[in-house]
From Swiss-Prot:
Protein source organism: Actinobacillus pleuropneumoniae serotype 5b (strain L20)
Chain's role: With S4 and S12 plays an important role in translational accuracy.
Upper taxonomic lineage: Bacteria, Pseudomonadati, Pseudomonadota, Gammaproteobacteria, Pasteurellales
Gene Ontology biological process: translation
UniProt cross-references to InterPro entries, sorted A to Z: Ribosomal_Su5_D2-typ_SF, Ribosomal_uS5, Ribosomal_uS5_bac-type, Ribosomal_uS5_C, Ribosomal_uS5_N, Ribosomal_uS5_N_CS, Ribsml_uS5_D2-typ_fold_subgr
UniProt name for this protein: Small ribosomal subunit protein uS5
Gene from which the chain derives: rpsE
Amino acid sequence: MSNIEKQAGELQEKLIAVNRVSKTVKGGRIMSFTALTVVGDGNGRVGFGYGKAREVPAAIQKAMEKARRNMINVALNEGTLQHPVKGSHTGSRVFMQPASEGTGIIAGGAMRAVLEVAGVRNVLSKAYGSTNPINVVRATIDALANMKSPEMVAAKRGKTVEEILG
């Protein structure tokens, strides 16, 4: 139990959006809340969660729990990306490219939160199409998951890392 608490303590958690939703029934409307969160260790691990409950704190707690269970590893290169990447989910498309030291995170809203908790310090990015936070987060994580490290590319091509990096 203490190991889990320690691990959770080193994760950065960010709340991206809280939304009130309603279900219409015969007797009127039933209100509930949704929460979108991202968690990351600031060193290449990131995950997102979407929770729904009758109360805001419960929705946030559910979202955080789902985010911790739904984490992926991202191969970063000294605080930036390995190469330009594209990602998409439904109507949202994102494009991200590596940036030199000192550039910072040039990204908007939901995409910025994902990149911050993932440990990316320098990146240029743009979201196209729908800017719905849930879809932008999914598209960003899709792009990060599709990023290949030089070691992976070298192994696939049967070359050395030095040949790949030029």
